[in-house]
Amino acid sequence: MNEMLTLVGQLRSDFGTSSARALRRQGKVPGVIYKKGITPIHVCTLEKEVAKLYRKPFFSSTVIQLQVDDQRFKVLPKAVQLHPVTEFINHIDFILVEQNGGIQKVKVPISFEGKDKSLGIKRGGYLNIVKRYVDLLCPVDKIPQCIKCDIANVPVGASIKVSRLELPEGCNLVKRTTDYVIASVIGKSSKQDKEEEGTAEDGADSK
């Protein structure tokens, strides 16, 4: 499991656009904690503190201990809204994580590795990333920071499907029945391959 991050917040009782704007003028971010079966918990936190966490690697898959007044919540980031110009964090939603070893749905980043060794990229292709995250069901104490995907042996024109990912023990895809594409190596079709095949054939004919 990732190292747990910490954040301090306050409960808020005023809602709506004007209230949210007032909080932002004070350097605070309105937020909501969600969990199926409970009433949403409205909170606010300091924008500068949220921004520090937001810039950390693997933010979306890291459990945060959120201290709200005299209560503590273990949460995962669900959605972050940024100002379109200033990139100030305007709003943040959290998911209250399952307790006592429960199974948690979480959005985990995909880390594409082996680009420097990729045969397809060396031959003029480039990596077209379709999905940067994968939705998993994980034990709360085994949420991975990221899921690695080795593309070293992926040729030009090949697609990489979600079934290629090696998931940690106990973690499963939310959509098990759909083997969707997460990336592909695209570029000029293998002119170089044809030239190499021609060279090989010439060599064979000369023997």
Swiss-Prot record:
The gene is rplY. It holds the Pfam family Ribosomal_L25p. One of its GO terms (molecular function) is 5S rRNA binding. Belongs to the bacterial ribosomal protein bL25 family. CTC subfamily. This is one of the proteins that binds to the 5S RNA in the ribosome where it forms part of the central protuberance. Part of the 50S ribosomal subunit; part of the 5S rRNA/L5/L18/L25 subcomplex. Contacts the 5S rRNA. Binds to the 5S rRNA independently of L5 and L18. GO terms for biological process: translation. Keywords: Ribonucleoprotein, Ribosomal protein, RNA-binding, rRNA-binding. One of its GO terms (cellular component) is cytosolic large ribosomal subunit. This is Large ribosomal subunit protein bL25. CDD domains: Ribosomal_L25_TL5_CTC.
